[in-house]
């Protein structure tokens, strides 16, 4: 056919196809300050996970009348076929949100996986996107992708994340190292980034106290379902915003928060290391999950997954912790936390985090609901998931899986304490993750078990949420990452680029 290329099934040449994608990109480029692109990670192989998400998006209470004439068996078979088709395309979805209306549009679907569980962007390289893979059979991976101008994601590299069920990625202050957190075996890894932003083999893997349980006992996920706190489960590594030097690791299994510094090596033949500066013990059984810091107040908020509460802390940053660390001088290695040597627990007055409030994420009447598994093991009817502070600093939100709602709180401008506003239905089942649009006018919620993403308008005065739109066929969403559309001008990679050049 010459320069026009071969026709596809719709009769479009390759050049015409590129033109269609460019037109779509131009439509997205009709700017509004709150226009946002959301990268949504999704589960694709549930048998590899520590938990068991259920895709209820095609059958159940929401079935329409058209399907009512079919038997349950026929509907299940149809559901499986549709879900298999969805999963074959799934991995990472790219959605665009209209900053005027809150409407969501599916832009691209990228076959990257399995089980993309966390998504983030390089701090200084706008083309570079990272994702972690969540699995317990082998070590998870950090997947490096290139974002193109037509909003596709091209995988360019993979490396080990240093442990299993990789659930969180972050960067140290110099941006020379990525920090990964692995839930299943409570291992933290430091991974050097090359000049193009590509992560290399982990330089240092650090085992949290008690983490050898996984290596020694080889627990099954059935054991995990019954005993969520039998061994450590590190869930996130969050950097304080005051100096960008202290990294807070929350461990669900230990009911503890550890405070680390990263010691960088003097040469690339030596290894970096985590240096523990403090740890904070929490009330047993809370099951802490994620920590966030207020933008202007020295206040931190911790969501406790197992009892559906938020703990509110005053933050105390010790000046001595900011002093220069001695340079690491050992070869890349596996390190184990020395509980007696490395744990530093202070009094309430000098603790890194001093709790002064604990508040439920559930409305009255839903706080004491319990269910029992088939084996008679107690389990709460709802478990808290993500926690985020609104960009305005005026409100805080938490996901409730089971209650299927987003809890809304007002933040006191003086002391950072919380006032419960309401729990708003999440627009689906099992709201696992959510994030705000560029200016905070909307919040997008990934509902895992209904395979949809719902957008809500945020009232700037009250903080209440109003459902605007639900985008279906987003397979088992588990992480929602926003990119302000205004920053897409910095993305220079085009769809025509065949070589991997960042």
Residue ranges of predicted features:
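Short coil/turn segments that connect the beta-strands within blades of beta-propeller domains
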Residues: 35-36, 126-127, 174-176, 242-245, ...
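Short loop/turn segments immediately following the C-termini of beta-strands
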Residues: 43-45, 134-136, 183, 193, ...
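Short loop/turn segments immediately following beta-strands, especially the blade-tip
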Residues: 95-102, 145-151, 190-201, 261-271, ...
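Surface loop/turn motifs at the tips and blade-to-blade linkers of beta-strand repeat domains
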Residues: 109-113, 158-162, 227-229, 279-284, ...
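Asp-box/WD-like beta-propeller blade repeats and closely related beta-sheet repeat scaffolds
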Residues: 152-236
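Surface-exposed loop and turn segments in beta-propeller and other repeat-based domains
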Residues: 204-229, 278-279, 328-378, 472-487
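Loop/turn-rich, solvent-exposed surfaces of beta-rich toroidal or solenoidal domains
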Residues: 381-415, 423-445
